[in-house]
Amino acid sequence: MPTQETIYEVADRVATITLNRPDKLNAWTATMEAEVRSAVEEAERDENVRVIVLTGAGRGFCAGADMSLLSAVATQGLDKDVTRRIHSGGAPQEGLRPDFQRKFSCFLGLAKPVIAAINGPTVGLGLVIALYCDLRWAAESARFSTTFAQRGLIAEYGMAWMLPRIVGLPDALDLLLSARHINASEALVLRLVNRVFPQEGFAATIHEHAVQLASSVSPRSLGVIKRQVYTGMFQTLAESFDLSVVEMVASLQSEDFKEGVAHFLEKRAPKFSGR
């Protein structure tokens, strides 16, 4: 389906979703949101896709919500359409925790890993979206800010829950209350990002690492481990332990387990089926 504000590509078992408003530093709009959700759902359904990458066109990842919308709300007030968009999420999914069915937390409920390839400025809502990705890989030029307090806003869309769990409570409060800007080096120290790569050739480097992830480990294991980790955030140790036993028994009966042992013993590259 033709898109207006995103680009969707699949290559080497990696689906890349590119936010495509480079002249606006990929500021977030209702159209972009709908297209990203559709692309993510398509990638999740596609058996040829094992890893999802979310990135931005041009020199930015996402500059947050489009300022024309914020300006309109500031001068004209909230209307029903804006209020509906604030509350909107995807269609309910049976068997999936409500925590993983909100507007952006739906990324956590996907079976496939989502990598934020942060190629430049990432602020406000853009940072919220990056937090809900499983891995955050940044270019040296990336800059980050929560921004909300500088706009008279609050920690939006669950950021007050996610950010402390990623960087710790003291640093989360620092970033939220001050809304200060940090560079990629400090973001790495804070563990806001997992890795920092050179700016030159960033997109190609990210694709190379994503392909490595897609080809070297079991997609079944990726999905189960991801679910274990995020579900574990709401469990006791005993509950997490018991779930791991159930999943261990299932994994020992899987085709990917047999292939995992076989490729190691035969000293060859794995050919995982995801089953």
What function would you assign to each model-found segment?
Residues 67, 100, 160, 169-172, ...:
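A general structural signal for well-ordered alpha-helical segments in protein cores
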Residues 1-57, 71-72, 76:
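Conserved CoA-thioester-binding segment of acyl-CoA-metabolizing enzymes
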Residues 56-106, 122, 152:
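Glycine- (often His-adjacent) and acidic-residue-rich active-site loop
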Residues 2-3, 262-275:
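Terminal low-complexity tails and localization/encapsulation signals of metabolic enzymes
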Residues 103-111, 117, 123-176, 205-210:
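CoA-thioester-processing core
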Residues 22, 137-142, 193-242, 255, ...:
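C-terminal long alpha-helix characteristic of the crotonase
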Residues 180-186:
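Acidic, divalent-metal-coordinating active-site segment for phosphoryl/phosphodiester hydrolysis
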